[in-house]
Design a protein with these regions (language model features):
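Aromatic- and Gly/Pro-rich donor/ligand-binding loops
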Residues: 1-78, 125-126
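Structural motif
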Residues: 26-27, 55-57, 85, 110, ...
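Catalytic donor nucleotide-activated moiety binding site of glycosyltransferases and closely related
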Residues: 60-65, 96-97, 144-145, 151-189
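A conserved, positively charged/aromatic
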Residues: 77-81, 197
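A short beta-strand/loop micro-motif in the catalytic core of glycosyltransferases
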Residues: 83-90
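Donor nucleotide-activated moiety binding/catalytic core segment of transferases
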Residues: 105, 109-113, 117, 172-198
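A short helix/loop element that forms part of the nucleotide-sugar donor recognition site in Leloir-type
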Residues: 119-134
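Conserved donor-binding/catalytic core segment of Leloir-type glycosyltransferases
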Residues: 131-146
């Protein structure tokens, strides 16, 4: 997937190589889901390695909280104040970051929503499971990161509420117990994931 859909710069893992990126690029873009969540903060995503004279932009960045803990506010001010532009995917996040940095932080769409329906359909047709698993009858598609009882209970409630019996489950961790009649996917790529959602 990554090789097909992205054009990557050479991998930079040591501080010296990361520092050299400043000579190779004149603009740096960061963003997306929870990159600035204070409970899992890594200043790398605040582009701490980028020199002051370089242009830094954050698109659809996310903090996923309604306030930044006081003991971390100086970190946010230090690194985000030098950004040329900050766009956040959450309205609350935009307000919090504006107040901290003194910058105008606009709220924008999640990048997933920037493509139209036809583009997503074309994308999904690249999957390995397309046409191998029928999607012509109604189904509930579940994506589980863990294996928690409340998720399975919620699934049963949804099945009853909508009268849909077919369930397709993709789980990162193998479920501890498999419910008879459900379809379990052990390997689905990103294209397949989108295929099941459309």
């Amino acid at each position: 997937f990554l090789k097909n859909e992205f054009c990557f710069a050479p991998l930079a893992t040591c501080p010296k190589d990361i520092e050299l990126l400043n000579k190779q690029y004149d603009k740096f873009l960061t963003g997306s889901d929870q990159i600035w969540n204070p409970y899992n903060l890594d200043t790398f995503y605040m582009l701490d390695f980028v020199k002051e004279d370089q242009k830094k932009i954050a698109y659809s960045s996310s903090i996923a909280v309604s306030r930044i803990p006081e003991e971390q506010q100086d970190i946010y001010k230090k690194y985000l104040s030098s950004f040329s532009a900050i766009f956040c995917r959450e309205e609350t996040g935009s307000k919090v970051l504006s107040a901290l940095t003194g910058k105008t932080v606009k709220t924008v769409l999640d990048p997933v929503l920037l493509l139209d329906e036809n583009s997503w359909i074309q994308f999904s047709h690249k999957g390995s499971l397309v046409n191998r698993i029928s999607v012509s009858t109604p189904y509930i598609f579940c994506y589980f990161i863990g294996d928690k009882d409340f998720e399975w209970k919620a699934l049963e409630t949804i099945k009853k509420q909508y009268g849909i019996n077919r369930v397709i489950v993709f789980s990162v961790a193998p479920p501890t117990c498999k419910i008879v009649g459900y379809e379990y996917l052990q390997s689905a790529d990103i294209y397949d994931f989108v295929w099941f959602l459309h």
